[in-house]
Amino acid sequence: MTTAPLILLAAGGTGGHLFPAEALGVELMKRGLRVRLVTDSRALRYSGLFSKDLTDVVPSETVRGRSPWALARTGLMLAAGTAVALNLMRVLKPAAVVGFGGYPTLPPLIAARLRGIPTVIHDSNAVMGRANSFLSKRVNAIATSLPGVLDKKPSLAGKITTTGTPMRPAILAAAAVPFATPGLGDPLRVLVVGGSQGARVMSDIVPGAIERLEPALRQRLILTQQVRDEDMARVRGFYDRLEIKAELAPFFADLPARLASNHIIISRSGAGTVAELGAIGRPSILVPLPGAIDQDQFANAGVLADVGGAIRIVQPDFTPDRLAAELSALAAGPARLAAMATAARTVGRLDAAGRLADLVMRVARTGA
């Protein structure tokens, strides 16, 4: 009996990297292939397609500074991870290795390259991440979520396929739920999230914005907010004082369904979040994470803002007064909310997992 080919999926240990890997894994398994995940220890927090039996943890390290000590530590950890990954390649003999970004993908992709195993990288950002940028010249094929990501590197043009960001089954199910435009007196459902790791700025700014809303609008609100454990008592006490109907939690396992059931999403603008908002088609207020060297979240938010599907607010401008004004304007304009939902859908790609699976299978078969 012939064993089905194995595809190794390498991803950093956060949702933005892991969820597209999971979506591709589901599609490849439907096609009769085997899959395994190579990642770092953070990924073990996530439930999903990849059980511990299907996961290999490889040592890795993110660059945390430019000092000689920090660079040396990173180099040593990546070298150790590459040694472990080389042994994995020898034992598992994958048909191809697919990387989804993050420094933990460097050891398995480098090891695959050294052993002559076909390689693909996928990047969900509007600006390619540093790990993928390093790997881009060394892999067989590059998949991007958006066109034009590597326009400044014409030498790579022959490797690039625009596939979109693969969506998990839960997102595809949520995408089938139409946007329910609220009437002027109807409940207004607002979801506040800060990415897979939470965001303290949401706990610092959103409560003050809610307090500044007109009492009639506050009474309409049904608020769901991701709040870190250390901020929970403070935020809950604030909303209790205002008598706001609010559900607070540090993490929502059913986030896709919650995205679909809300009228306005307030969030960071990680690549995965932006792709999911486009796929599901929901109006959003996006606050890019500041301080990134390549400003990837600012560019990601622009993908939705430029078509009218989102409002982008840079963090220095993200104040209680500004947020209250934006929420008040959206609540007073149901037609605008409906138009934003429709606009957001124009950037969604529901067939991305299939398109990426086609590319991976071709590279595994031909090496090109």
Curated annotation (Swiss-Prot):
One GO cellular component this record assigns the protein to is:
plasma membrane
EC top class named in words: transferase
Q: Which positions in this protein are listed as binding UDP-N-acetyl-alpha-D-glucosamine? A: 14-16, 125, 168, 196, 297
One family from Pfam that matches here is: Glyco_transf_28
What is the reaction catalyzed?
di-trans,octa-cis-undecaprenyl diphospho-N-acetyl-alpha-D-muramoyl-L-alanyl-D-glutamyl-meso-2,6-diaminopimeloyl-D-alanyl-D-alanine + UDP-N-acetyl-alpha-D-glucosamine = di-trans,octa-cis-undecaprenyl diphospho-[N-acetyl-alpha-D-glucosaminyl-(1->4)]-N-acetyl-alpha-D-muramoyl-L-alanyl-D-glutamyl-meso-2,6-diaminopimeloyl-D-alanyl-D-alanine + UDP + H(+)
HAMAP family assigned? MurG
The name under which this protein is listed is UDP-N-acetylglucosamine--N-acetylmuramyl-(pentapeptide) pyrophosphoryl-undecaprenol N-acetylglucosamine transferase
> Taxonomic lineage of this organism?
Bacteria, Pseudomonadati, Pseudomonadota, Alphaproteobacteria, Hyphomicrobiales
